[in-house]
Amino acid sequence: MSIRFIYGRAGSGKSLFCINQIKKLIDSDKEKKIILLVPEQYTFTTENKVLNYIGERAFLNTHVLSFRTMCQKVFEECGGRVKQIIKDTGKHMLINKVLNEKIDDLSYFKKMSREQGFNNIISELITEFKKYNINIDALRDLTDKIDDNELVEKIRELSLIYEEFNVKMHSSYIDTDDELTLLAKKLLANNIYANSEIWIDEFTTFTPQQLEIIRILSKASVVNITLCMDKIENSDVEDITNVFSSIENTENRLLKLMEENNIGYLNPINLNSKLPYRFKNSEELSHIEKYCITYPFKSYKGKNKDVRLYKANNTYDEIEKVAKDIIRLVRDRNYRFRDISVVCRNIENYNKIISVIFNDYEIPFFMDQKIKLLNNPLIVLITSAFEVVLKNWSYESVFKYLKSGLTGFNIYDIDRLENFVLEHGIKSYKWNEEEIEKLKNIKIENGATEDELTIFNLMEEVRNSLISFHKLIEGKHYVRDICKALYEFLLSIKAFERIDEWIIKFEELKLEDKVKEYKQVESIVIDMLDQAVEVMGSDVVDTFEFFKILNSGFENEEIGVIPVALDQVNVGDIARIKGREVKALYIVGINDGILPAAHKDEGILSDRDRIELKEFGIVLAADGRSKAFEEQFVVYTALTIASEYLMLSYPMADFEGKSLRPSIIISRIKKILPNLVEESSLYDLSKRSDHFNKVISPIPTFNELIFALRRELEDEDIDEEYWGEVYNWFKENEDFKWKIENTFKGLRYSNTGEKVSRNKLLSLYKNDLGKLSFSVSRLEKYAECPFSYFIQYGLKAKNRKVYEFTPPDLGSFVHDILDSFTNKVKKEKIAWSDLDMIKCKNIVSELIDTKLKEDSGSILNSTNKYKYFSKRFKRVISKSVSVISEQMRRGEFEVFNNEFSFGSYNDGEAIVLELPSNEKVYLNGRIDRIDTLDLEGSTYLRIVDYKTGNKHFDLNQFYYGLQMQLLVYLDALIKNSEYILKKQALPGAVLYFKVDDPIIKTKGDITTEELEKEVLSNLKMNGLILKDAKVVKAMDRGIETDGYSLVIPAALKKDGDFKAGSEVVTEEQFTLLREYVNKKMIDLCEDMLCGDIKIQPTKDSDGSHCEFCDFSSICQFDSSIEDNKYKIIMKKSKDEIWNNIRDELNDDKKEN
């Protein structure tokens, strides 16, 4: 018999020609058997075409098949597989088995073979070998011919794996990749298609397996093959840069097959001689088809009406524009949704946003994409049940298991359990029965609540359900036993029953996609376990090995879906759009590197390897360079699929705001269609032509109405006059009536804290003794944001407790150790000058060890991680105290006291603030260290506050009430110095000291002395110092000789005056600061009690308080709302701050 080629470029009517010829054959010979062979993904649409053009009678003797369905049909009629077919999951398991057995024979792939996903790579390569008829002998013969040692090693080991795989496979099973080989044998033995008419359409290329089927069919039948090409002339020279190169290559291979097998060559049909059928109604689209890949090209001179180009701000803007345009086509131009398709090259980046927006716009659509099973709750349940044992009962694995929704525990109990587990750090061995019982007894001794006892019972239920399963799978077991244990575990927790219940709910909600997914997932899991038993049942593996095999199978499982309705917009990948009748096409995401797609992953066999193998007659799939030019054909197909209307779009930024560049396709189209206007949100042609362009479907129209109302409230001009009628429509509509009312409330909504009565606030803030007792840090928090303060200290809101070592915990720990260190030095009468690094290290180590021993339940004793932290803290604190000792050694100040508390009635009385409203506020606090100096009959005070973070004194922050602590402490000590020191004191300095072990960066070698100086400089105290050279020199003797200090922020000129940059203030200025801080505290307290709970976070050049606030979800501060404004901390000069302080104090004195 013979083969005939049907040539035609895109849109020339090749598929229609085939169907018309089939119709003529049916009319002339009703008994003639006809086969229409198309790619698998096009069978459904092709059957619809045949049904529409010919009618039901076509299917009496005409069969629309793919190569796979041809296998099934032939095997049904002639008998076929005598062995069980192995699925992809079983194939991966078999490959895993081969790799484990042959691991010692591998060198190149030995390490690689243990990596996750390697099985998939080998599976794909074996499939490729079979599709291209590459046998083991052909691979082995190469090892003596190739000079590339690395490639020889790859081929040798691949041959070994390939051979062993085939031996194990063919002993009991048949691979889906072998089906076409078996089909060829059946067709040769059973001439079932003799005298048939075969039509092959929509193929770009054929694998050697498929070519063999075509060869056999053409021996007994007439075979017609469509080729998407623009010429009939044959060329022996392959030009891969030609967009039709892959088709031409297919043609050459078919001609060679015909020549070698003496197959007749019928006169070809050329459909390129007339105007393309598809574009009979659109000159623009016809012009694009003709010149989008042609060099040189001609520009289209006509008026543009069928092509649009849209530059979107982002993907949301892009898809919303597409949705609006689809509605326009359906509403104004009488399109059906089924006439429209939306395609892109990266559907996984668009599927969610398309689903959301199309549902809002009430556009029915079919997402032509397979569903990945890895995130299905049943799969999550199974993988997490294994992860619990493999990850030793980690928090993540336990709650991943519980939150799968299939364990039988209700979400309220799971949430309570999660809070309890986080609070007590329950993970790993703490899930042991003994540890839980120990914690339970401690709770009972301390008066456990009923809620806590319920949680312990819940923990026991969780443990029991998993422990019984883990006992059956831990260690090494036969695969069949692990599969049985897993299946029985799923039955015991009634997972399948809950899946069935969900399916019923999905059916009630008409969620067809979910129904299909959940109906299939159960059978997929059981099939996978069956495959595991069939393939590896007698193999002994450990839990991790089995989990790897199982997880690999789940990663590759996908569920195919078919359209549930006829009138839907088709959404999918560009590569799957062929074969459809599309009147209007939207191509989205036309960005550089995305369309055309960039092929980077070469796999085990690189492009170079494939080219070298091709030289020795081993032809495999296309290399990266060829794929790049094949991608041009994909682009050509996409641009030419629409018959009436084409809209191209690209976003300028992705979801993260990262800028994107337009594809080269955009510039090409602009040149071909010079009259094409690039639209955007700023220049939208539809707004000019459609006065009602914002009135679309109810939800988006409702959103536009809200924007219009918002603009009106803000006194902006509104061009549209129809919003009043739109508002009335929504007001009368039952579905939107309540929404419109709530929205109006929202538009008038003022996000401000409600006024709270003074009495209520007093009752909230007073302590158990009925006093208003605050710390200075609390007042600073109020200055940062009044509302945040009210939530934390008024309503007593707290974060979920988590068993972790937080920065505040570190601060308390460091303060305790430094306090103990100072007390030990004082008690044992050790002079600071006698402390060196070794002594400091020994004392600190002893203090920390003692503290951790006394507090056996400390988190620092819990895990190796925290034990390492405690060692690190020893190093940091040792370095810090050695620096403190050096600072004390360099000066004349002496430590008077440390951890001095006022307001606790142990060291000193509270600071009392008398408010204008006659309430008294008692301030309490703790001073880390008080140093004193007796000089020339006067006593000077130095306040030192230890900080574990980067805290620097900022006069600007002090002015706004955000850094008051040091000055409050200084004022309290000076006012009470007669009582505390037994003599009047003067201000010397207020300083922060950072507790740290700094890393010193150097350029080359450094001496020990230089290193010590660098450390001192890095840990130099910062704050304010009295502008008195004698006092400053008493803090650091070295300043006199060096001119600068390594201890304090001060430097002296040669004449004894202070250099610029020295943080010094006069005694009078210290007095001003003390007076101002008292005034500021009174103002803040009075403001706090007035009842106006302002949502007013502070903001400066470094950011806003909201960035670190735990309560931002409560206040919902939004700077776009008129009433929500930041309290801006303006950066003022020092002179301006001093002038403001003086002015405010003077004004205050005048008022009083």
Curated annotation (Swiss-Prot):
Highest taxon listed in the record's lineage: Bacteria
Catalytic class of the enzyme: hydrolase
Domain UvrD-like helicase ATP-binding: 1-338
GO biological process, one term: double-strand break repair via homologous recombination
GO MF annotations, alphabetized: 4 iron, 4 sulfur cluster binding; 5'-3' exonuclease activity; ATP binding; double-stranded DNA binding; helicase activity; metal ion binding
Binding site for [4Fe-4S] cluster: C785, C1106, C1109, C1115
Pfam families registered for this protein in UniProt: ADDB_N, PDDEXK_1
Cofactor section: Mg(2+); [4Fe-4S] cluster
E.C. no: 3.1.-.-
Cofactor: binding comment: Binds 1 [4Fe-4S] cluster.
Span of domain UvrD-like helicase C-terminal: 276-579
Residues noted as binding ATP in the record, renumbered to the chain: G8, R9, A10, G11, S12, G13, K14, S15
Key words, A-Z: 4Fe-4S, ATP-binding, DNA damage, DNA repair, DNA-binding, Exonuclease, Helicase, Hydrolase, Iron, Iron-sulfur, Metal-binding, Nuclease, Nucleotide-binding
Segment forming the signal sequence: none
InterPro entries recorded: ADDB_N, DNA_helicase_suAddB, DNA_helicase_UvrD-like_C, P-loop_NTPase, PDDEXK-like_dom_sf, PDDEXK_AddAB-type
Additional remarks: Despite having conserved helicase domains, this subunit does not have helicase activity.
Family: Belongs to the helicase family. AddB/RexB type 1 subfamily.
Task performed by this protein: The heterodimer acts as both an ATP-dependent DNA helicase and an ATP-dependent, dual-direction single-stranded exonuclease. Recognizes the chi site generating a DNA molecule suitable for the initiation of homologous recombination. The AddB subunit has 5' -> 3' nuclease activity but not helicase activity.
Subunit field text: Heterodimer of AddA and AddB.
HAMAP family: AddB_type1 (MF_01452)
Protein name: ATP-dependent helicase/deoxyribonuclease subunit B
Species in which this protein is naturally found: Clostridium botulinum (strain Alaska E43 / Type E3)
Classification lineage: Bacteria, Bacillati, Bacillota, Clostridia, Eubacteriales
